Amino acid sequence: MARYIGPKCKLSRREGTDLQLKSGVKPFDVKTKKANKAPGQHGQARGGKQSEYSLQLREKQKVRRIYGVLERQFSNYYKEAARVKGATGENLLKLLESRLDNVVYRMGFGSTRAEARQLVSHRSITLNGRRVNIASIQVKAGDVIAVHEGAKQQLRIKNAIELAAQRGIPAWIEVDHSKLEGTFKAAPDRSDLPAEINESLIVELYSK
């Protein structure tokens, strides 16, 4: 399955929530005046009753789109989350949050996860001093992520840092924006992760 490259607000409207696919800190209903309508020519208003399966599928699609992960990748993350000790849903979110592109975004070096992914693929990011270009690398506690010297003057990185200052940096990450460098202190606890995600619906979907 190819990665979606169409209008970002369309995906957020489909899921009925801000997937944080666009830069900026404006509320979802300000970013798009059609927030309460599904995409499509006739954009039906939300509120109709959905089946249990539909709710589970929508939650999976929502999370997959938030993190920019393809279907097969997401399925593999779920299998890994189910294999290790602990709550499967929480494990899944930890795996997604520990992706290098997500950590780059959380540190404020990219204004969106897509932009952070591009920085990684263009080798503008270093991991423990080495340039890398694989966005899905699992970052571990103590790993140091930094913007490569040759990319430090990029305007988009400076803009992203300004947005991050408004958005806030998670407690499980330590960042020095003056050096464009940060440390992944530990995998986040569930309380540190987005409350609007209902991972239990995803577990129910894959458990069928």
From Swiss-Prot:
SMART domains: Ribosomal_S4, S4. Keywords: Ribonucleoprotein, Ribosomal protein, RNA-binding, rRNA-binding. The gene is rpsD. GO terms for molecular function: rRNA binding; structural constituent of ribosome. It comes from the Bacteria. GO terms for biological process: ribosomal small subunit biogenesis; translation. Belongs to the universal ribosomal protein uS4 family. Residues 98-160 form the S4 RNA-binding domain. This is Small ribosomal subunit protein uS4. Disulfide bonds: none annotated. CDD domains: S4. NCBIfam families: PRK05327.1, rpsD_bact. Residues 24-52 are annotated as: Disordered. One of the primary rRNA binding proteins, it binds directly to 16S rRNA where it nucleates assembly of the body of the 30S subunit. With S5 and S12 plays an important role in translational accuracy. The keyword Acyltransferase does not apply. InterPro entries: Ribosomal_uS4, Ribosomal_uS4_bac-type, Ribosomal_uS4_CS, Ribosomal_uS4_N, S4_RNA-bd, S4_RNA-bd_sf. GO terms for cellular component: small ribosomal subunit. PROSITE patterns: RIBOSOMAL_S4, S4. Part of the 30S ribosomal subunit. Contacts protein S5. The interaction surface between S4 and S5 is involved in control of translational fidelity. It comes from Acinetobacter baumannii (strain AB0057). It holds the Pfam family Ribosomal_S4.
